Swiss-Prot record:
EC number(s) given by UniProt: 2.4.2.21
Reaction equation(s) it catalyzes: 5,6-dimethylbenzimidazole + nicotinate beta-D-ribonucleotide = alpha-ribazole 5'-phosphate + nicotinate + H(+)
Organism domain of life: Bacteria
MF-aspect GO terms: nicotinate-nucleotide-dimethylbenzimidazole phosphoribosyltransferase activity
Transferase keyword on record: yes
InterPro entries per record: Nict_dMeBzImd_PRibTrfase (IPR003200), Nict_dMeBzImd_PRibTrfase_bact (IPR017846), Nict_dMeBzImd_PRibTrfase_N (IPR023195), Nict_dMeBzImd_PRibTrfase_sf (IPR036087)
HAMAP family in the cross-refs: CobT
Gene giving rise to this polypeptide: cobT
CDD domains per the UniProt record, alphabetical: DMB-PRT_CobT
UniProt similarity note: Belongs to the CobT family.
Protein name: Nicotinate-nucleotide--dimethylbenzimidazole phosphoribosyltransferase
């Protein structure tokens, strides 16, 4: 598998960043999370004057073999149909990208359909759909490695275009199932608490989904390593997103983490490279069952709680103005000395 050079941000600049933030014309700590974000971004970028450049949202798309077991309300053709909607600008992620100035990239990681690549979709297809992990591994070792490498390749292109803040989204009917499997494997939270309605299952549907996933977990006979669990239960788009996250961290980019699926992707990524979490900002807590539990297990502090469960990167993009405010705070607020205000604490 491709290796990455991911290190914790150098702490040498922390004291200077903290002093700058504390000497802005406000009571110490009074801008709360904005101050925490400014410190984190300053550490990532190793500067007292951080900036956000050319924000991009990448949607990785693929189909899932486990859908054959009736674990999703939506048929798998919704995957390619929604991609068509992205291309026409009519999806939830489209208006948010337009509103907040994000470039949108759509990547075919493994859609079970022949997509119109000439219309701007990035063709990184590894295979048409993952396999059904109720019976066999979702992907081979070679396919997993290709996903990691191709996700990294997309991010290197974003970086070359001047991007330093990256939101990652997904499109793939069945991917909440893979997310639940990773969540229970890596946090040891009982599977039943990790399984939710996905795109809208009723209580009976959720119970059936849980039963199928529990059978898959019971049938698993791998070595139990993070690498093997990612390969066995993962989605092609999700593993490609892991490659993207790891490459972004190596390039010292800000990673905006979206909802339940992307949270479990960075959870999985952190099993391979724990330092990746230093580059992550968690955009929101979604409405999918299990999202709060996995965030809590990671010690993550999401910026928003809007009851979202769409995916696509929508929650991460919604959080962007808060991140922008944090950067503006450290760059645009005056300090006590320059403003001739007595420092009163």
């Amino acid at each position: 598998m491709k290796t990455f050079q991911i290190t914790r941000p150098d702490e040498t600049i922390r004291e200077a960043l903290t002093d700058k933030i504390n000497n802005l014309t406000k009571p110490k700590g009074s801008l709360g999370t904005l101050e925490e974000l400014a410190l984190q971004i300053g550490l990532i970028q190793q500067t007292l004057t951080p900036e956000l450049r050319h924000p991009q949202n990448i949607i990785f798309a693929a189909d899932h073999g486990i859908v054959d077991e009736g674990v999703s309300l939506s048929p798998k053709e919704i995957t390619w149909q929604q991609i068509s909607n992205f291309l026409h600008g009519g999806a939830g992620v489209n208006f948010l990208c337009r509103q907040h100035g994000f470039e949108l990239k759509i990547v075919d990681a493994g859609v079970d359909y022949d997509l119109p690549y000439e219309k701007g979709i990035i063709n990184m297809k590894v295979r048409k759909s993952s396999r059904n992990y109720l019976y066999e591994a979702a992907m081979t070792e070679e396919e997993m490695n290709l996903c990691i490498e191709r996700g990294a390749e997309v991010v290197r292109q974003c970086h070359a275009e001047g991007c330093n803040v990256l939101s990652l989204g997904e499109m793939g009917i069945g991917n909440t199932s893979s997310s639940s499997m990773w969540m229970t494997c890596f946090t040891h939270i009982p599977l039943e608490l990790c399984v939710g309605a996905g795109s809208g299952l009723d209580n009976a549907g959720v119970r059936h989904k849980y039963n199928v996933l529990q059978q898959a977990l019971d049938h698993y006979q791998g070595d139990g390593s993070a690498h093997d669990l990612i390969r066995y239960f993962g989605g092609l788009e999700m593993v490609m997103a892991i490659g993207a996250m790891l490459q972004a961290a190596e390039l010292k980019m800000i990673i905006l983490v979206d909802g339940f699926i992307m949270t479990n992707c960075i959870l999985a990524a952190s099993q391979l490279y724990p330092e990746v979490l230093h580059y992550a900002i968690f955009g929101h807590q979604g409405d999918e069952a299990g999202h709060k539990l996995v965030l809590d297990a990671m010690g993550a502090k999401p910026l928003l709680n809007l009851g979202l469960r769409l995916g696509e990167g929508t929650g991460a993009i919604c959080s962007y103005p808060i991140i922008d405010s944090a950067v503006r705070m450290i760059n645009e607020m005056d300090n006590f000395a320059h403003a001739a205000i007595t420092k009163y604490f």
